[in-house]
């Protein structure tokens, strides 16, 4: 169990490192751009192909760094971006897609001179298993409140 918590903490640290690196390099954005993202990712009908997700994630990080989005909003919209079936819950596949998306986003970011983050698939599967332990109602999904109130996310 300690190994899984450490793995979870490393995954979260990697995600937050990407967020911090992206936020530090971005310029101030207009509040109306934040409102547009809020509207887009709160909508029921969302187009979620990888290219759009990458662009929107980069914009969210930029807006969070500029103070137009709070860190809680950033977490929430990142959660929503990966809720592909719009059931307000993440299953194991959606969590794995979120981790792979974060990994691919880091690898595509060659202009900042950093070494790409490579997360072995086995570690991502272990991460998903550890997150599913936060499933309070044992329905096989993680809701946003379950994720945010779990012991794992309190380590962020």
Curated annotation (Swiss-Prot):
Q: How is its activity regulated?
A: Resistant to inhibition by host SERPINE1. Inhibited by PMSF, aprotinin, antipain and leupeptin. Inhibited by Zn(2+).
Q: Which residues bind Ca(2+) 2?
A: 135, 137, 139, 141, 146
The protein's matches in SUPFAM superfamilies, at most eight in alphabetical order, are given as:
EF-hand
Induction is noted as: Up-regulated after blood feeding. The highest expression is observed at 96 hours after feeding and in fully engorged adult ticks.
Question: Temperature-related activity notes?
Answer: Optimum temperature is 37 degrees Celsius. Active from 20 to 45 degrees Celsius.
Phenotypic effect of disruption: RNAi-mediated knockdown results in impaired blood feeding of ticks on a vertebrate host. Impaired development of a blood pool, an accumulation of blood and tissue fluid formed at the tick's feeding site. Massive infiltration of host inflammatory cells at the bite site. Increased expression of host cytokines, such as IL5, TNF/TNF-alpha, PTGS2/COX2 and CCL12/MCP5. No significant effects on tick activity and health during the incubation period. No significant effects on tick attachment to a host.
Name its GO BP terms in alphabetical order.
Answer: venom-mediated fibrinogenolysis in another organism; venom-mediated fibrinolysis
Domain called EF-hand: residue spans: 70-105, 123-156
Is the keyword ATP-binding assigned to this protein?
no
- Localization of this protein: Secreted; Cytoplasm
Q: Which UniProt keywords apply?
A: Blood coagulation cascade inhibiting toxin, Calcium, Cytoplasm, Hemostasis impairing toxin, Hydrolase, Metal-binding, Protease, Repeat, Secreted, Serine protease, Signal, Toxin
Q: Does the keyword Cytoplasm apply?
A: yes
For this protein, what is any one GO molecular function term? calcium ion binding
Give the tissue specificity: Saliva (at protein level). Salivary gland (at protein level). Not detected in midgut, ovary, trachea, Malpighian tubule system, synganglion and cuticle.
Q: Which residues bind Ca(2+) 1?
A: 83, 85, 87, 89, 94
Stated EC number for the protein is 3.4.21.-
Tell me the function of this protein. Anticoagulant and fibrinolytic protease that modulates blood feeding of ticks on vertebrate hosts. Degrades host fibrinogen and delays fibrin clot formation. Promotes lysis of fibrin clots in the host by activating host plasminogen in the presence of soluble fibrin. Binds Ca(2+). Hydrolyzes serine protease-specific substrates. Required for the formation of a blood pool, an accumulation of blood and tissue fluid developed at the tick's feeding site. Blocks activation of host AGER/RAGE. Reduces AGER/RAGE-dependent production of reactive oxygen species (ROS) in human endothelial cells.
Q: Any extra remark in the record?
A: Immunization of mice against the protein induces protective immune response and results in slower tick feeding and smaller blood meals.
Record note on quaternary structure: Interacts with host fibrin. Interacts with human RAGE/AGER.
Instruction: State the name under which the record lists this protein.
Output: Longistatin
């Amino acid at each position: 169990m300690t190994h899984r918590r450490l793995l979870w903490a490393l995954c979260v640290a990697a995600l937050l490192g990407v967020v911090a690196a992206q936020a530090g390099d971005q310029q101030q954005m207009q509040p109306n751009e934040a409102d547009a993202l809020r509207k887009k990712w709160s909508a029921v009908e969302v187009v979620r192909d990888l290219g759009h997700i990458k662009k929107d994630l980069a914009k969210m990080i930029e807006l969070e760094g500029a103070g137009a989005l709070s860190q809680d909003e950033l977490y929430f919209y990142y959660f929503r971006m990966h809720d592909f079936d719009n059931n307000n819950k993440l299953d194991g596949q959606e969590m794995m897609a979120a981790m792979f998306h974060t990994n691919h986003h880091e690898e595509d970011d060659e202009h900042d001179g950093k070494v790409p983050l490579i997360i072995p698939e086995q570690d991502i599967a272990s991460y998903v298993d550890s997150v599913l332990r936060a499933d309070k109602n044992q329905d096989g999904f993680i809701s946003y409140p379950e994720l945010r109130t779990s012991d794992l996310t309190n380590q962020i």
